[in-house]
């Protein structure tokens, strides 16, 4: 449930926690009815920001929300915290709620720009800009650091890491060599593919190697 659910005390929106929990529990029950062993994950962004998670999951606990795993996104481009801080966040949250945790999204630039020269979705990371440059080696070294930190989460409560997006590589448009035929979606207005904003953060280069 998520991808991702955003909520903290600063978000100005109507609060219907009871309705939200009914929705979550209905989804949980539906999943278990079909596949009892499947895990239900509630996914928030800003992994490493404990205050957002405690605000949200405290409210869910009060109302008896049912779920198995806490999911979190962690992108250095949008975080002030490094991989070690992400590990400590995992320790804190998993212990507080007695739940396994999973990093549902992460990513890092291996090239400063997309193939067309424009910036992609993930810009320079303030926390890593002087440590890991936007190169293939910098990309690999960041991922190695993150994996090693999360492997050391207490009691193996971090189940793993999902990379976003590993394979949405640049697919050249023969009619426009700077354009990519891969992207988030096809626009209804002109049947053209939307911009591929992650082609410089994949696990492959622009040529799929």
Residue ranges of each PLM-predicted region?
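Aromatic-rich peripheral "rim/lid" segments of glycoside hydrolase catalytic domains that contact
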Residues: 9-12, 88, 92-95, 111-145, ...
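The substrate-binding groove and active-site-proximal loops of carbohydrate-active enzymes
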Residues: 13-19, 46, 73-80, 128-138
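Short, well-ordered beta-to-alpha junction loops that form the rim of enzyme active sites
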Residues: 1, 44-46, 106, 163-166
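A structural signal for short coil/turn segments at secondary-structure junctions
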Residues: 35, 64, 97, 154-156
